[in-house]
């Protein structure tokens, strides 16, 4: 009997240990599954945010491996080569920690403490929250590692000095996560956070001083150095301000690159194709709310031709332009300049044609262009290049004509303007 009791006691003990171990194992499995689920959610969020930040757009060479860097960015201060941000341990960021990544994104410093140049827009990315930064890092660490060493940047003297860069940062860089405007709605603040931070709109749509620093943060427009394109003001209805646009049309422009009265070309077309088309409906709506709210700044008014005092030579100048327009442009854009909505953009009343800088219009005539291929506009109509057909003088005549016909009023364009527009990114 004693042996039986001992046997039963041992059996109960074994069963208790077994069930206890099973309970611990189950708890561990649940915890591990929960961790995997959390990690998956973080990576998915990071993938979305990396797209909104257009990380791949810069950190991928033309025809190269995604995120492996090697793209050359030509600026007034030298040629910068983007870095490999895949998790390769030798040539990428495989040995980086979350803290290292945060230091780069928020403080503009590399893992080794080296100061980074603002061609990497940490001046805007500093507004990104730590939670979002960690999510982007988790996504980048989930990518396949690519072993790719990239050439060093070729920065002109004296801009290659870390001491001078430190001085530049003291004068022009203010770090800090986005602070919500409590007088605005949650939706407005979300749009502002995306546009000012990850979207880094101000990196292009701003006027810069001789040291390359943004002169304001109100998206008043400016020429994009090294690209030879003009990023129009987003706060002026004379350029690309959206204060009088319906929200749905702004959303359509962000996500498809095309509306009945407008389309994106050049660098902005690439941003829509690579980044903005992937905005969630909620975030696109929020960004539209923010962009629509920007105050009007109509200081960049182009001086048009005064037809009441126009000389015979000026009249002949525009008449010659009209003849060239009829021959090369009228088939698509029409005699009335109204084009075909959503297909061939209207030139009559088109702000991109009449804004102070004629640069984008000149480049479009020279090099042609297509709106971005997007989910909402999978087969865009395009315009052929005329650089091989028209002389600079003829391009100037056509652009001057369309800037001063059908009620348009803007300054005339010369062959010198056309010559200066050559080069840069098409």
Predicted regions: what is each one?
Residues 28-41, 60-79, 111-192, 196-197, ...:
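Flexible coil segments in periplasmic/lumen-exposed cytochrome c-class electron-transfer proteins
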Residues 247, 257, 348-393:
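Extended, polar beta-sheet/loop recognition surfaces of beta-rich domains
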Residues 93-105, 109, 113, 135, ...:
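Aromatic- and charge-enriched surface segment that lines or borders ligand/interaction sites
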Residues 39-60:
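Mature N-terminal segment immediately following signal peptide/propeptide cleavage
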Residues 8-21:
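Bacterial N-terminal signal peptides
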Residues 55-58, 201-204, 329-332:
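Short cysteine clusters
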Residues 320-363:
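C-terminal structural cap/anchor segments
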Residues 1-4:
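Positively charged n-region of N-terminal signal peptides that target proteins for export
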């Amino acid at each position: 009997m004693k042996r039986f009791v001992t046997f039963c006691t041992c059996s109960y003990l074994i069963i208790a240990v077994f069930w206890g171990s099973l309970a611990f194992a189950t708890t561990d499995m649940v915890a591990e599954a929960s961790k995997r689920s959390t990690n998956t959610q973080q990576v998915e969020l990071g993938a979305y945010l990396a797209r909104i930040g257009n990380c791949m757009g810069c950190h991928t060479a033309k025809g190269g491996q995604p995120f492996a860097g090697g793209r050359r960015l030509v600026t007034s201060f030298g040629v910068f080569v983007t870095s490999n941000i895949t998790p390769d341990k030798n040539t990428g960021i495989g040995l980086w920690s979350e803290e290292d990544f945060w230091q780069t994104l928020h403080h503009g410093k590399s893992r080794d403490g080296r100061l980074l140049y603002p061609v990497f827009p940490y001046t805007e990315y500093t507004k990104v929250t730590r939670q979002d930064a960690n999510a982007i890092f988790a996504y980048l660490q989930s990518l396949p590692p690519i072993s790719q060493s990239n050439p060093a940047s070729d920065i002109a003297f004296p801009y290659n000095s870390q001491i001078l860069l430190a001085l530049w940062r003291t004068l022009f860089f203010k770090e800090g996560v986005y602070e919500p405007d409590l007088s605005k709605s949650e939706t407005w603040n979300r749009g502002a956070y995306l546009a000012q931070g990850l979207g880094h709109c101000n990196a292009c749509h701003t006027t810069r001083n001789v040291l390359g620093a943004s002169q304001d943060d109100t998206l008043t427009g400016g020429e994009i150095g090294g690209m030879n394109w003009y990023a129009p003001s987003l706060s002026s209805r004379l350029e690309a301000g959206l204060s009088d646009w319906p929200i749905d049309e702004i959303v359509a422009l962000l996500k498809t690159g095309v509306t009945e009265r407008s389309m994106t070309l050049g660098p902005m077309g690439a941003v829509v194709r690579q980044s903005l088309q992937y905005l969630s409906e909620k975030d696109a709506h929020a960004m539209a709310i923010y962009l629509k709210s920007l105050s009007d700044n109509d200081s960049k008014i182009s001086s048009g031709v005064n037809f009441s005092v126009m000389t015979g030579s000026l009249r002949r100048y525009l008449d010659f332009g009209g003849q060239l327009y009829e021959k090369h442009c009228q088939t698509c854009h029409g005699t009335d300049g109204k084009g075909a909505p959503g297909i061939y953009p209207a030139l009559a009343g088109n702000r991109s044609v009449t804004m102070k800088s004629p640069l984008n219009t000149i480049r479009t005539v020279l090099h042609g262009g297509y709106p971005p291929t997007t989910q909402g506009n999978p087969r865009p109509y395009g315009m052929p290049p005329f650089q091989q057909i028209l002389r600079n003088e003829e391009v100037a005549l056509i652009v001057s004509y369309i800037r001063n016909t059908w009620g348009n009023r803007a300054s005339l364009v010369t062959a010198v303007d056309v010559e200066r527009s050559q080069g840069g990114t098409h």
